[in-house]
């Protein structure tokens, strides 16, 4: 596995692979990798001949009171995980490489509607930052396919819409959330949790799963169901950002007729914001 830091080096390496007829996959990350990231890269290696991963902590997607400065940078450990997972090329640009003209006047990519509400409501500008950096990476690499985790369900929806609307010839693949044995979705931010918080954190997925089970059993009073689960989460020590049931395709509020639903949640355990979701198809 080679590691490059400049767009010029990245494009040269990708061009060599493409000239050899290789199918190219991209997995963008912010580093501090866990086994969920490794699973994405392994899936990419199964679907493509040449796997590119990126590590870039993108300032554009962090709000003023978020953890940009403290987000863990663990490059050496990340390189080892990527190598073991089957990555061929790692791109680790600095901020000046990604935004050479500064961020104040950077052209931005905005995906309306899907970027609003849910995480977009509590993190203004977040998805604009995500869409912008991912579109830049797509232009730099021009992959045949890109793989993202379904844990960030709204982010995946935003990227799918961006690719569709901007006619990018890239296949977007969502991979199921990787979980710890107790159900907690793997996240780089889980490392912020202390021992007691980590023990309580699986209650988030439990509430989501119980919501899905109730709907599958025929429950139609979503408001009462969600209110009871919010109380359950608060009792477990969470401060709730949102817990909602949406149409899985449009992320609009669901109707009784929607066959394809997603239950989405974001909540704080101490100072750590955790997100999770569960996709549900009603027969």
Curated annotation (Swiss-Prot):
Compartment annotation: Cytoplasm
Catalytic reaction(s) noted: (R)-pantoate + beta-alanine + ATP = (R)-pantothenate + AMP + diphosphate + H(+)
Keywords linked to the UniProt accession: ATP-binding, Cytoplasm, Ligase, Nucleotide-binding, Pantothenate biosynthesis
Main EC class the enzyme belongs to: ligase
Gene3D superfamilies reported in the protein's UniProt record: HUPs (3.40.50.620), Pantoate-beta-alanine ligase, C-terminal domain (3.30.1300.10)
A Pfam family per the record: Pantoate_ligase
Active site: 37 (proton donor)
Gene Ontology CC: cytosol
Pathway this chain belongs to: Cofactor biosynthesis; (R)-pantothenate biosynthesis; (R)-pantothenate from (R)-pantoate and beta-alanine: step 1/1
Residues engaged in binding (R)-pantoate: 61, 155
Family membership: Belongs to the pantothenate synthetase family.
Oligomeric and partner information: Homodimer.
Task of the protein: Catalyzes the condensation of pantoate with beta-alanine in an ATP-dependent reaction via a pantoyl-adenylate intermediate.
Protein name from the UniProt record: Pantothenate synthetase
Gene: panC
């Amino acid at each position: 596995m080679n590691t490059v830091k400049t767009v010029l080096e990245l494009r040269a390496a990708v061009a060599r692979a493409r000239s050899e007829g290789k199918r190219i996959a991209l997995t963008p990350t912010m580093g501090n990798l866990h086994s969920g990231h490794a699973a994405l890269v392994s899936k990419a290696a199964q679907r493509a001949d040449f796997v590119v991963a990126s590590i870039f902590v993108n300032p554009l997607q962090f709000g003023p009171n978020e953890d940009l400065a403290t987000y863990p940078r663990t490059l050496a450990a990340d390189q080892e995980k990527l190598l073991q997972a089957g990555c061929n090329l790692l791109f680790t640009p600095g901020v000046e490489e990604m935004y050479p003209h500064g961020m104040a006047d950077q052209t931005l990519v905005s995906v309306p509607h899907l970027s609003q509400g849910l995480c977009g409501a509590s993190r203004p500008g977040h998805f604009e930052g995500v869409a912008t950096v991912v579109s830049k990476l797509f232009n730099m690499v021009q992959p045949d396919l890109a793989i993202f985790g379904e844990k960030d369900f709204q982010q995946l929806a935003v990227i799918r819409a961006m690719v569709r609307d901007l006619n990018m010839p890239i296949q977007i693949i969502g991979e199921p959330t990787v979980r710890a044995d107790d159900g907690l979705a793997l996240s780089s931010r889980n490392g912020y949790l202390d021992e007691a918080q980590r023990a309580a954190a699986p209650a988030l997925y439990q509430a989501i799963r119980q919501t899905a089970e109730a709907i599958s059993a025929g429950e139609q009073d979503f408001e009462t169901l969600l209110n009871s689960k919010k109380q359950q989460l608060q009792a477990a020590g969470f401060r709730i950002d949102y817990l909602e049931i949406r149409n899985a395709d449009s992320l609009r509020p669901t109707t009784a007729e929607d066959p394809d639903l997603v239950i989405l949640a974001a909540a704080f355990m101490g100072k750590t914001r955790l997100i999770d979701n569960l996709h549900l198809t009603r027969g």
